[in-house]
């Protein structure tokens, strides 16, 4: 009886361990999938995470199309990504295109691209920008630009390939959002809104395409050492900087490798580091569950993590208040 009782207690833990081990094995197999002759399209591919994704895809044998507005940067990026190719038959193509233009123009460019490079196997929506500042200090022009590029640009580019992917019965659609799509941050009100919108779009799109063999992944990278981040730093409020520093600064190659691996493994959510794991667990809600082991972790950790998140929020509010007091003191002294 004691032995039977012990087995009954241990069985759930053994089952969980088996699920986790199998999930890790499956992840390793799928994330190392060969991309030889597969066509991968990357928007925002001339710099930052987008360019690093180009390197990762090229290392795995893919034919890569880098899309961006600046032709000079595209030429330089093409040269760099070419150096990562592992096969002489690989092709690295560039397309100068503003994905915030009218959809008809984008659609035509993608039709021409398919004739040149073949059907799309994966599209990685990396184009985006952030203008930091309090809402009252953010111009309406900057608000429009952020929503057009961060949200509408990704929607338009995806719309240009989704019908083809569904008809061919396979494909991967990747959206590079931000940890700011999980939590609103001081000085990033509009940016957060645009990334939250992208997350909602991706969840709905996943329902539309999953039965057609098309997978959707949303990546939530932390602060990453890119030219875009360097530009943000120029106008970033002190409050935003202090809050952001709690997650550290990641290298674009590290972030890109994780995004591509998670996408190939069929994960809906891709994060980096402990902060990313905490946020994705807390914000899982009705998001698609594509990994049983991760689902079990969410069930057990969501409660404790909520306490941790409350402590984070108190700390953030303390930082904001501290900055406000310092500013008021400075005003009085002037």
Task: Describe the function of each predicted region.
Residues 60-77:
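Conserved glycine-rich Rossmann-like NAD(P)H-binding loop of the short-chain dehydrogenase/reductase
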Residues 126-131:
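Conserved NAD(P)H cofactor-binding loop of Rossmann-fold oxidoreductase domains
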Residues 134-135, 142-144:
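Substrate-binding pocket helix/loop in short-chain dehydrogenase/reductase
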Residues 158, 194:
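Active-site helix of classical SDR
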Residues 178:
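Residue(s) in the substrate-gating loop at a strand-loop-helix junction
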């Amino acid at each position: 009886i004691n032995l039977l009782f012990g087995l009954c207690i241990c069985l759930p833990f053994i089952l969980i361990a088996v699920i986790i081990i199998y999930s890790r094995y499956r992840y390793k197999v799928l994330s190392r999938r060969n991309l030889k002759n597969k066509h991968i399209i990357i928007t925002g591919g001339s710099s930052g995470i987008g360019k690093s994704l180009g390197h990762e895809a090229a290392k795995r044998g893919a034919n890569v199309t880098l899309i961006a507005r600046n032709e000079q940067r595209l030429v330089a990026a093409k040269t760099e990504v070419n150096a990562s190719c592992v096969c002489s038959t690989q092709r690295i193509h560039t397309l100068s295109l503003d994905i915030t233009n009218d959809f008809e123009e984008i659609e035509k460019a993608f039709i021409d691209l398919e004739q040149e490079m073949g059907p799309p196997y994966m599209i990685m929506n990396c184009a985006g920008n952030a203008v930091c500042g309090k809402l009252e200090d953010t111009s309406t022009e900057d608000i429009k630009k952020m929503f057009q590029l961060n949200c509408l640009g990704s929607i338009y580019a995806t719309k240009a390939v989704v019908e083809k992917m569904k008809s061919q019965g396979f494909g991967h659609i990747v959206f590079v959002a931000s940890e700011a799509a999980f939590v609103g941050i001081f000085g990033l009100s509009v940016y957060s809104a645009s990334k939250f919108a992208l997350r909602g779009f991706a969840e709905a799109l996943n329902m539309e395409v999953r039965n057609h063999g098309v997978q959707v992944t949303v990546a939530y990278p932390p602060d990453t050492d890119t030219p875009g981040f360097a530009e943000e730093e120029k106008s970033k409020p002190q409050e935003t900087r202090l809050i952001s520093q709690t997650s550290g600064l990641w290298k674009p190659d590290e972030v890109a490798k994780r995004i591509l691996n998670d996408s190939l493994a069929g994960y809906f959510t891709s994060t980096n580091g402990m902060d990313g794991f905490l946020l994705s667990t807390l914000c899982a809600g009705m998001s698609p569950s594509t990994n049983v082991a991760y689902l079990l972790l969410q069930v057990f950790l969501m409660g404790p993590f909520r306490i941790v998140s409350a402590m984070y929020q108190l700390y953030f509010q303390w930082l904001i208040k501290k900055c406000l007091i310092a500013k008021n003191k400075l005003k009085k002294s002037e």
